[in-house]
């Protein structure tokens, strides 16, 4: 019988590949998504549709509202940058403590499930400078998980936070996902989609996605609101 793993699953390119990686590693994935007041809820709609198709044993969607905290263009009326040159500075699309919050929910569910494995699709190469996508953060949270839980303190097992995409480029992630059978037409990456759910093609996330597909030599199957170089 395969081991259970909680997989943070947004419906985006990286998290969908990460879920496929969990399955390939022999885990039974329990997908965990969040409706946190983000403007790009079409991503969550993709997650709801795709989770059963990729073999998730269960798919939990947790609702809470980070708009009450604000501090991000993804949870406020602040404009999402378009067409900028991506650098190492932390952008306005950073959501304060988001991955810490997400991983905390994942840890709680994992403890209830009797699982000691959590998967997250963070990437430290082709990303927008987010502090909670770095190896140091993953290592620190893993240590916290083993200090902050009944199961960890009682020595029932050792929690591990798996980040299989951490050191891959976006092109490598896409190629790996295709090897694992991921259908990227069922994923969404855009931070600021149209009301019809079309990707803008200009935000950081769209730029990184398009760049990844171009470098992989593969046409991006996503639907865009404007002509893009695929």
UniProtKB/Swiss-Prot annotation:
| Keyword DNA-binding recorded | no
Record Pfam families: QueC (PF06508)
| Gene Ontology MF terms | ATP binding; ligase activity, forming carbon-nitrogen bonds; zinc ion binding
Under which pathway is this protein filed? Purine metabolism; 7-cyano-7-deazaguanine biosynthesis
Chemical reaction(s) catalysed: 7-carboxy-7-deazaguanine + NH4(+) + ATP = 7-cyano-7-deazaguanine + ADP + phosphate + H2O + H(+)
The role this protein plays is: Catalyzes the ATP-dependent conversion of 7-carboxy-7-deazaguanine (CDG) to 7-cyano-7-deazaguanine (preQ(0)).
Details of cofactor binding: Binds 1 zinc ion per subunit.
Q: What is this protein called?
A: 7-cyano-7-deazaguanine synthase
Family stated for the protein in its record: Belongs to the QueC family.
List the EC numbers from the record.
Answer: 6.3.4.20
Question: Which GO biological process categories is it annotated with?
Answer: queuosine biosynthetic process
Per its UniProt record, the required cofactor names are:
Zn(2+)
Binding of ATP, residues = 9-19
* InterPro entries linked: QueC, Rossmann-like_a/b/a_fold
Sites where the protein binds Zn(2+): 190, 200, 203, 206
> Which superkingdom heads the taxonomic lineage of this protein's source?
Bacteria
Q: Which UniProt keywords apply?
A: ATP-binding, Ligase, Metal-binding, Nucleotide-binding, Queuosine biosynthesis, Zinc
Q: Do the record's keywords include Metal-binding? A: yes
């Amino acid at each position: 019988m395969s081991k259970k793993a909680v997989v943070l699953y947004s419906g985006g390119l990286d998290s969908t590949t990460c879920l496929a990686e969990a399955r390939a590693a022999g885990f039974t994935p329990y997908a965990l998504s969040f409706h946190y007041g983000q403007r790009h809820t079409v991503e969550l709609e993709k997650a709801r549709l795709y989770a059963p198709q990729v073999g998730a044993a269960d798919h939990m969607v947790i609702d809470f509202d980070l708009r009450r905290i604000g501090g991000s263009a993804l949870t406020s009326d602040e404009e999402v940058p378009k067409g900028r040159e991506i650098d190492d500075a932390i952008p306005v699309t950073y959501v304060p403590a988001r991955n810490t919050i997400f991983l905390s929910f994942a840890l709680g569910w994992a403890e209830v499930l009797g699982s000691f494995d959590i998967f997250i699709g963070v990437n430290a190469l082709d990303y927008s400078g987010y502090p909670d996508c770095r190896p140091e953060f993953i290592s620190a949270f893993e240590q916290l998980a083993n200090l902050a839980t009944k199961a960890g303190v009682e020595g029932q097992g050792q929690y591990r936070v798996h980040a299989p995409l951490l050191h891959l480029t976006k092109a490598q992630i896409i190629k790996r996902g295709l090897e694992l059978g991921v259908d990227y037409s069922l994923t969404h990456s855009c931070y600021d989609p149209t009301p019809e759910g079309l990707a803008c093609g200009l935000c950081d996330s769209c730029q990184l996605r398009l760049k990844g597909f171009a470098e992989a030599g593969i046409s991006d199957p996503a639907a865009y609101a404007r002509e893009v170089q695929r």
